[in-house]
Amino acid sequence: MCSAPGGKSFAAAALMHGEGRIMSYDLYESKLSLIREGAERLGIEIITAAARDSSQPDPDCIGAADCVICDVPCSGFGVLAKKPDMRARVGERIADSELPQLQSRILAAASLYPRVGGRLLYSTCTLNRHENEEQVEAFLAQNSGYSCEQMHTVFPDPDLPAYLRTDGFFYAVLIRNT
């Protein structure tokens, strides 16, 4: 979900050794060529890219997936080193924007797709707790059928990604229990 440009789909395909099927969704049709071209360049045949609004549940996918990667739109504070234009906005209150509400809707829709025992990976490229830990904690409080297997912010010093010229990101692996 929110798959363009396709890096996580490509990594998942490599882990799957060409077995199974990956559905890579993105809101914008114009971004799907990045996924399709990347898959072709890498010789990956198990990826199908399609345009869809990930914040809206797809009845055809409910309970059908072993694993769902939910890489939501975010403020991007973990990739400031790559995006100098964002540095000027660091002081802005991005967390108070509509992003957390959109993230919550996408996570809620994504949570319908794993089978019982399946996994849901929630990820962002931000270090903002409001978009990360707090988002997952709120989801778990409202969804007793899920538990958290692991939750981790990846960056040695969450305050300094731009200065050290490295990226930071967050992920949580959730298990569907019922």
Task: Describe these PLM feature segments.
Residues 1-178:
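S-adenosylmethionine
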